[in-house]
Amino acid sequence: SEMGPLVTKEHLERVKGYVDLGVKEGAKLIVDGRDIKLQGYENGYYIGGCLFDHVKKDMRIYKEEIFGPVLSVVRVTNFDEALQLINDHEFGNGTSIYTRDGDVGRTFANKIKVGMVGINIPIPVPVAFHSFGGWKRSLFGDLHMHGPEGVKFYTKLKTITSRWPSGIGSDPEFVMPTMK
């Protein structure tokens, strides 16, 4: 896959620090992208994808938002436990489910409490005209400023209610109009 650099050296060091911490906390690092070197971009802030397995709920790599290419597998025994695990988390940016069962996908989308839901896609990053952002402590500010919510924020709403009675020459009435 293709991924650009992180924004700053501090961001890169923070993400690498989370990977180090995950190893220290006992999660199994399956894919380690910390030492990636790109020819011609040696001074860039690059880190390859990292994948942890056997992550536990008390680990910081589970409890905190990393904002880097780090995925964690937290094992559960059934669908309801998976829903509960995600819904109980204090953050709610995005989550994904992979399934061949449409009923499971719809149930997941309806019951999950996060801002962005992916079904059979990795991280759900919507296209430009959709709002971007999470729920709970993952939302920065009080509005999603990208997409329709941003347009609504910067737009003055005007509501017009009208009635077009038949006949221009009718006498004025002082009654609430009703449908006939």
Regions found by a protein language model. Give the residues of each.
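Conserved C-terminal structural/oligomerization subdomain of aldehyde/semialdehyde dehydrogenase
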Residues: 3, 19, 24, 39-180
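Short beta-strand to alpha-helix junction loop
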Residues: 5-15
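Short secondary-structure junctions
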Residues: 26-37
